[in-house]
Swiss-Prot record:
InterPro entries: GHMP_kinase_C_dom, GHMP_kinase_C_sf, GHMP_kinase_N_dom, IspE, Ribosomal_Su5_D2-typ_SF, Ribsml_uS5_D2-typ_fold_subgr
Lineage, opening ranks: Bacteria, Pseudomonadati, Pseudomonadota, Gammaproteobacteria, Pseudomonadales
Keywords: ATP-binding, Isoprene biosynthesis, Kinase, Nucleotide-binding, Transferase
Coiled-coil ranges from the UniProt annotation: none
TM regions (residue ranges): none
Organism, scientific name: Pseudomonas syringae pv. syringae (strain B728a)
Protein name in the entry: 4-diphosphocytidyl-2-C-methyl-D-erythritol kinase
Active-site residues, as the UniProt record annotates them: K13, D138
Catalyzed reactions per annotation: 4-CDP-2-C-methyl-D-erythritol + ATP = 4-CDP-2-C-methyl-D-erythritol 2-phosphate + ADP + H(+)
E.C. code: 2.7.1.148
Biological process terms in GO annotation: isopentenyl diphosphate biosynthetic process, methylerythritol 4-phosphate pathway; terpenoid biosynthetic process
GO molecular function, one term: ATP binding
C-alpha cells in the first residue's frame, strides 16, 4: 500500500434514545433520536488519482465494491460536482456491519468530507449533508459532526450537548437488518413526541429494543449481562448494546469481566466528532 495523502477517522455513533412516532405514507418512520459520537471508529486513507477512477483498495467481506457506501459517496460527489479527478481509498474496518453504530454511514460522510478537501471543491456543510442524505438517513449527522437531536426520518438535526461519559459497547456476533426491524408488526409506532430541551434523559428509551431482543437472543444476552452493572441500552436497530460509566477505569473494569465471552470496546462519548476535530487542524 502506498502512503495515503490524507488519513481520517470515521467515528462510531450511539443513539442514546430512539422513539418511533408513527409510519409515514411513503413507508418511512417518523422518529426522534439523540446522536452522540464515540472516540472510536474506522480509519480511511485517501490519495488523488488523475484518471477519474474511484478505487476502494480494501475488500469488505460481503459487500461488492460498487455497493459500498464509500464508493457510492465518492461517485455521487464526483458526479454532482463535475470533478474529473479520481481517488484511491483504503479502509481499516473496526466497526461492525449491522451494529447500529453507524459504520457505513460514517465511512460515507468521511469520504465526502475528505474528497471535498482533496479535490478542493469548496462545498459547504449544508450541501454535503444534503448529498449525504441521498446515501442514508444517518450520513448528515456525521457530515455535520455535532451531537444532535434528530427528527423526521432522522434528517432534521438540532445540535445538543449531552454529558460525555465513558461507554462500554458490546458487539454481539449478529448483523441486524434495519428494514427487518422497522417492518416488524409488533414494533411500537405510537410514542408521543418529546421536546428537544432539556436533553432527554429519564423518559428516553429505544422503541426497537423489544423487537430486536425477541428476534436476536444474542442481543438479549448482551443486554442482560451488561444490565448487571449499569443501565444497558440498544443503539439504533442493533445489534450493539452500551452502558455509560463515570470514568474509564470503571468501564474498563466491567469490560474485563464481560469481554471474556463477548466482543466489546471502551470509548469516550464526544459531542464534537473526532473527524471534525481532525479536519479543524488541516
Amino acid at each position: 500500500m502506498s502512503t495515503p495523502q490524507l488519513v481520517l477517522p470515521a467515528p462510531a455513533k450511539l443513539n442514546l434514545m430512539l422513539h418511533i412516532l408513527g409510519r409515514r405514507p411513503d413507508g418511512y418512520h417518523e422518529l426522534q433520536t439523540l446522536f452522540q459520537f464515540l472516540d472510536y471508529g474506522d480509519e480511511l486513507g485517501f490519495s488523488v488519482r488523475e484518471d477519474g477512477e474511484i478505487h476502494l483498495q480494501t475488500d469488505v467481506p460481503g459487500v461488492p465494491h460498487d455497493s459500498n457506501l464509500i464508493v457510492k459517496a465518492a461517485r455521487a460527489l464526483q458526479q454532482q460536482s463535475g470533478c474529473t479527478l479520481g481517488m484511491d481509498i483504503w479502509l481499516e474496518k473496526r466497526l461492525p456491519m449491522g451494529g447500529g453504530i453507524g459504520g457505513g454511514s460514517s465511512d460515507a460522510a468521511t469520504t465526502l468530507l475528505a474528497l471535498n478537501h482533496l479535490w478542493q471543491l469548496g462545498w459547504d456543510e449544508d450541501r454535503l449533508a444534503q448529498l449525504g442524505l441521498t446515501l442514508g438517513a444517518d450520513v448528515p449527522v456525521f457530515v455535520r459532526g455535532h451531537a444532535a437531536f434528530a427528527e423526521g426520518v432522522g434528517e432534521i438535526l438540532t445540535p445538543v450537548d449531552p454529558e460525555e461519559p465513558w461507554y462500554l459497547v458490546l458487539v454481539p456476533q449478529v448483523s441486524v437488518s434495519t428494514a427487518e426491524i422497522f417492518s416488524d408488526p409488533l414494533l411500537t409506532r405510537d410514542t408521543p413526541p418529546i421536546k428537544v430541551r432539556p436533553v432527554p434523559k429519564g423518559n428516553s428509551r429505544n422503541d426497537c429494543k423489544a423487537v430486536v431482543e425477541r428476534r436476536y437472543p444474542e442481543v438479549r444476552n448482551a443486554l442482560n449481562l451488561l444490565g448487571k452493572f449499569t443501565e444497558a441500552k440498544l443503539t439504533g436497530t442493533g445489534s450493539c448494546v452500551f452502558g455509560a460509566f463515570p470514568n474509564k477505569a470503571e468501564a474498563d473494569k466491567v469490560s474485563a469481566l464481560l469481554t471474556e465471552t463477548l466482543t466489546g470496546f471502551v470509548a469516550k462519548g464526544s459531542n464534537i466528532s473526532m473527524l471534525h476535530r481532525k479536519l479543524q487542524i488541516l
